[in-house]
Amino acid sequence: MGRIIRNTISYGFVTLILAALGFCIYLFLDDLDGPEVTMAPDTGRISPTQEITLKLADAKSGVRSVVVTIHRNNQSLVILDKVFSEPAPVQTTSFNLKNAGLRDGAFELEITARDNSLMSFGKGNGTTRKWNMQLDTQPPK
């Protein structure tokens, strides 16, 4: 009789461990996609004082952070590095290039957003989008 109880407890414990393992695997594999990133205006030309608005969306786990980087002439400059206090399915944020110290001409704008999933050892899924932009500091004549 003691052996039956011991075996039942052992099987119950193994079942509990397997269920917990299955749940952990589900959590890791439930959200494999990074956030959607949209930018407005998306014209390719911009002035330093023009506000650029980002809309970041991740319905499953919410948006955790965004980093905006400018690449020009083999140099990189981070314009915005923001971690949202509360991950939400949709986040919006704005920035401009007023304090970037850029001159007229072409540059690449890179936006990387991360969600609040457990992927990448807790860093979340990431999405990186790049736009070729043209900075125009001269007012229209």
Give a label for each model feature.
Residues 99-106:
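Surface-exposed, short loops/turns at beta-strand junctions within beta-sandwich domains
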Residues 56, 111-115:
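Conserved structural position at the C-terminal beta-strand
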Residues 85-96:
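Aromatic sugar-binding surface patches on proteins
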Residues 21-37, 123, 129-141:
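Proline/serine/threonine-rich low-complexity linkers at boundaries of modular beta-sandwich domains
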Residues 114-123:
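Short, solvent-exposed loop/turn segments at the edges of extracellular beta-sandwich modules
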Residues 58-73:
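Solvent-exposed loop/turn segments flanking beta-strands in beta-repeat/beta-sandwich domains
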Residues 2-17:
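N-terminal Sec-pathway targeting helices
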Residues 42-55, 63-65:
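Contiguous beta-strand segments within globular domains
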